[in-house]
Curated annotation (Swiss-Prot):
One of its GO terms (biological process) is symbiont-mediated perturbation of host cell cycle G1/S transition checkpoint. A motif (Nuclear export signal) lies at residues 99-107. The keyword Kinase does not apply. Plays a role in viral genome replication by driving entry of quiescent cells into the cell cycle. Stimulation of progression from G1 to S phase allows the virus to efficiently use the cellular DNA replicating machinery to achieve viral genome replication. E7 protein has both transforming and trans-activating activities. Induces the disassembly of the E2F1 transcription factor from RB1, with subsequent transcriptional activation of E2F1-regulated S-phase genes. Interferes with host histone deacetylation mediated by HDAC1 and HDAC2, leading to transcription activation. HAMAP family: PPV_E7. This is Protein E7. Pfam families: E7. It comes from Bovine papillomavirus type 5.
């Protein structure tokens, strides 16, 4: 707070604001229970100019399965699908928290390619 010199002027008072009545209602939000297959089928990768990455590229729905090998060694087997439909099996050593983050990464704009698609699209 800043103290100034004593003043004998009084400023005019502002009029009171108009009264506002808020009516609040309880909102119910439905859970969005889309699985990985549905999200992957809806995903269409594009560049900033909205053109497809490769002509004829249309990812198919690919299931993502994560199975834990054992509680001791924290090895998980992850099965995802290449856009061509070929299943890819990956062994991942991770903590349960990190494997959840890996699953979220797989749900994002990330495609894992089989060796055939990788060599065909990107060379050897």
């Amino acid at each position: 707070m800043v103290a100034g010199p004593a003043c004998s002027k009084f400023l005019p008072q502002d009029p009171p604001p108009p009264s506002v009545t808020l009516v609040l209602h309880d909102l119910t939000q439905e859970e969005d229970e889309q699985d990985f297959v549905t999200l992957h089928a809806q995903y269409r990768p594009t560049f900033k100019d909205k053109t497809p990455r490769r002509p004829g590229y249309n990812p198919r729905a690919a299931p993502c399965h994560i199975q834990r090998l054992s509680a001791r060694c924290s090895v998980f087997f992850v099965q995802v699908g290449c856009p061509c439909g070929q299943p890819l099996k990956i062994a991942v050593q991770s903590t349960p928290d990190c494997i959840s983050q890996f699953e979220q990464l797989l749900r994002g704009p990330l495609d894992l390619l089989c060796p055939h698609c990788a060599s065909r699209c990107y060379g050897r």
